[in-house]
Amino acid sequence: MIKKLGLNFKNTKKVTNELKQRIASVVIALIIFRIGSFIPIPGIDTTILSRILNDQKGTIIEMFNMFSGGALSRASIFALGIMPYISSSIIIQLLTLVIPSLSEIKKEGEVGRTKINQYTRYTTLVLALFQSIGIVTSLPKISGMNQIIIHPDFYFYFTAIIILVTGTMFLMWLGELITECGIGNGISIIIFIGIIAGLPSAIVHTIEQTRQGDLHILLFLCVLILIFSVVFLVVFIERSQRKIIIHYAQRQKGRRIYSTQSTHLPLKINMAGVIPAIFASSVVLFPVTIISWFGIDRKCYLLKTIFFYFQPNQPLYLILYVFSIIFFCFFYTGLVFNPRETADNLKKSGGFISGIRPGEQTAKYINKIMIRLTLFGSLYIAFICLIPEFMRSAMNVPFYFGGTSLLIVVVVIMDFIAQIQTLIMSSQYESVLKKANLN
């Protein structure tokens, strides 16, 4: 196969060495991340914090703690995790829609992308600062955490805030370093490692339950089959595309006449990714988190009712969760894909869709297809996110992953494999072009 592609041993060795270096860079960066997640902030009693967080099942705190690889429950220097960066990225994307100057910067290509990334970093710093101040100052006010700070003086608060902000900025830099020198999206890989950090212990616990008879062996096998089926569905949907055929009219360049060419515009079914699931979880779990985290008096009938009906296994929670996912899918897809802009670019490049007039009609046609795809994609995300809830409540199965986490894990693995394939294929094409004296 190597000979057919025109590759020699020297080039193959070069690709292998580059791949090894990139994978080594990712591994080293992730080892640093995991070590940092075990370094505690000085002055906090981590035993009290860990005990309180163990009671925060089915809240935003549990989800954020999972994303940080347990760093939040250990009050580590990476307790804030990478969430401020994700939030700032979405905020900047929103601002590019409402602020004309930012919209123009976005269209400037590589230079504009660099500026947008810089604004995202500044916003991350501001968000991390506000979040760290909020967390550190509110810790003693939380029910059961009166003694969590050993010496609650100015020096502690100042040091803790600086450490948390620095930890988040370091993770952001580490993620960008992985993206540049490693393989895949660095931020996604950091979240991925945070999620799977507790997977080995969860697997051992499930196997132990099966061995002791607490979990029937047939039910265990059914769960395994269901998990593999869900993973297959996620891979299938994430790789699926709706291709719109684009034609380019006959054109003349010098003495050469180029005939009509055709290509396609690929539209992913789930263009919004996992962001809608994260936002939907945060919004729906917010009331329970506030009541549980700050110990609001549950004797109040209204608060008691809210706390009960917003539990993850309640019908109201599930209905609101599904509708939130659908809403955020449409909302975020509108941010990342603009049919009118796509139609204008096609018109400028001489492309058109058969039977559709260029310009406004093309934009409406693409938008119509996107609405259908987004609806299907949102229902798919909702289905994936509800499966773990069903397994926990109806089947009484201890499932470590939530639907959001499962989506992130599978999508990141797919992206990682795709990046490796791209690296290998690009090297193969380069070798073929050199051998044919085309490069």
UniProtKB/Swiss-Prot annotation:
Gene3D superfamilies reported in the protein's UniProt record: SecY subunit domain (1.10.3370.10)
UniProt entry keywords in alphabetical sequence: Cell membrane, Membrane, Protein transport, Translocation, Transmembrane, Transmembrane helix, Transport
GO cellular component: plasma membrane
Transmembrane domains' residue ranges: 23-43, 77-97, 125-145, 154-174, 187-207, 217-237, 274-294, 317-337, 369-389, 397-417
Protein's job: The central subunit of the protein translocation channel SecYEG. Consists of two halves formed by TMs 1-5 and 6-10. These two domains form a lateral gate at the front which open onto the bilayer between TMs 2 and 7, and are clamped together by SecE at the back. The channel is closed by both a pore ring composed of hydrophobic SecY resides and a short helix (helix 2A) on the extracellular side of the membrane which forms a plug. The plug probably moves laterally to allow the channel to open. The ring and the pore may move independently.
Subunit structure: Component of the Sec protein translocase complex. Heterotrimer consisting of SecY, SecE and SecG subunits. The heterotrimers can form oligomers, although 1 heterotrimer is thought to be able to translocate proteins. Interacts with the ribosome. Interacts with SecDF, and other proteins may be involved. Interacts with SecA.
Protein name stated in the entry: Protein translocase subunit SecY
Originating species: Buchnera aphidicola subsp. Schizaphis graminum (strain Sg)
Gene: secY
